[in-house]
Amino acid sequence: RIITGFYAGRTHSIIENRDCALGVTRNKEVLDRVIAHMEKFHIQPYDENTGKGLVRHVLIRYGFFTDEMMVCLIINGEKLPGEEALVKSLCQIPETVSVMVNVNKKRNNVILGEKVRLLWGQPYITDKIGEISYQISPLSFFQVNPYQTGRLYGKALEYAQLSGNETVWDLYCGIGTISLFLAQK
């Protein structure tokens, strides 16, 4: 049986759930379509204990300021059966601008592999923090709530009292959202 959900704390046991409180309402529709596709094409979910199965994860990225959505399936192989049918199904969701596959054939519990293949659309979505737009790929680290991130960065900018002559080091920065935000000053 195919389930979606979250890892229980400090385990690799999955707590079944399709409604992420941090996510957007479209997440459930995406997951329903992916599961229907897996069932139609007899695609097995990945089993971390055996290393068998194809679909490891479904990564959904959503641009809160642009309403752009990316769906990326992380797979334990090179090709997903029925890729064209999956693209057709996911593109019925109006916000979809990108459908991708990420290949992770390593027997580990790391989510993403290094190889990304675009099935349809753009290789990224765009979102904003403050007045700065960012192009976000499946491999990008980006905050899950850009509204609150913008407010938090605004406070940091206020407290930093920058004159514009400082050098900011954004260590472990993901895609550099903090330093780019502070560079406004």
Language model regions located:
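Accessory RNA-recognition modules of RNA-modification enzymes
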Residues: 1-185
